[in-house]
Amino acid sequence: MSQFSHYNEDGLPKMVDISSKSATSRTATAECRVRISPRLYEAIHEQSLKKGNPLPVAQVAGIMAAKKTAEWIPMCHPILIQGTDLSFKYEPVKDGYMLVIGATVTVDGNTGVEMEALTAVTAAALTFYDMCKAVDKSMVIEETLLVKKTGGKNGDFYHPRREKMD
């Protein structure tokens, strides 16, 4: 028998059977940061980007990606997501601004939604980059992380680098 949960007795990949797990309310919140130049920040706020406002498009991309996570990540189970919400805020940093993208995904199910939240913020960041690259190709997508998760057999998790959120 394989010592790894995602490999069968022949050593080949398999999807774990979650049918015996209890359905519970679960949430996951992820975050991704995109470092941008002052020039790009100004262009966004002056609404002078040729492609238009990047945030609504990034928001839709994040929601769509959360729903398609099982198609992107081989061992993720397709799940019926109850909700996905994204947030965007700019923070001033040395030499520019940081766009902080957050995503919270909820489900009542027998597996968690951590990967869905992480996929949502990643897709939103990539879409933001695509919408803005004509002005600033030096953007840096950085620090993608799971901020918190609630529910499930293993209980709640709060990333040690973030304050505990209620």
UniProtKB/Swiss-Prot annotation:
> Which keywords describe this protein according to UniProt?
Lyase, Molybdenum cofactor biosynthesis
Q: What does this protein do?
A: Catalyzes the conversion of (8S)-3',8-cyclo-7,8-dihydroguanosine 5'-triphosphate to cyclic pyranopterin monophosphate (cPMP).
Tell me what this protein is called: Cyclic pyranopterin monophosphate synthase
Q: How does this protein assemble?
A: Homohexamer; trimer of dimers.
Biochemical pathway: Cofactor biosynthesis; molybdopterin biosynthesis
Recorded hits in NCBIfam families, A to Z, give: moaC, PRK09364.1
Entry's EC annotation: 4.6.1.17
Could you say which protein family the record assigns here?
Belongs to the MoaC family.
Q: Name one GO biological process term.
A: Mo-molybdopterin cofactor biosynthetic process
Q: Does the keyword Lyase apply?
A: yes
Q: Which residues bind substrate?
A: 75-77, 115-116
Domain of life, source organism: Bacteria
What organism does the UniProt record list as the source?
Shouchella clausii (strain KSM-K16)
- The catalytic site is made up of 130
Q: Which InterPro entries match?
A: MoaC, MoaC_bact/euk, MoaC_sf, MoCo_biosynth_MoaA/MoaC, Mopterin_CF_biosynth-C_dom
Mind listing the GO molecular function terms for this protein?
cyclic pyranopterin monophosphate synthase activity
Reaction(s) this enzyme catalyzes, per UniProt: (8S)-3',8-cyclo-7,8-dihydroguanosine 5'-triphosphate = cyclic pyranopterin phosphate + diphosphate
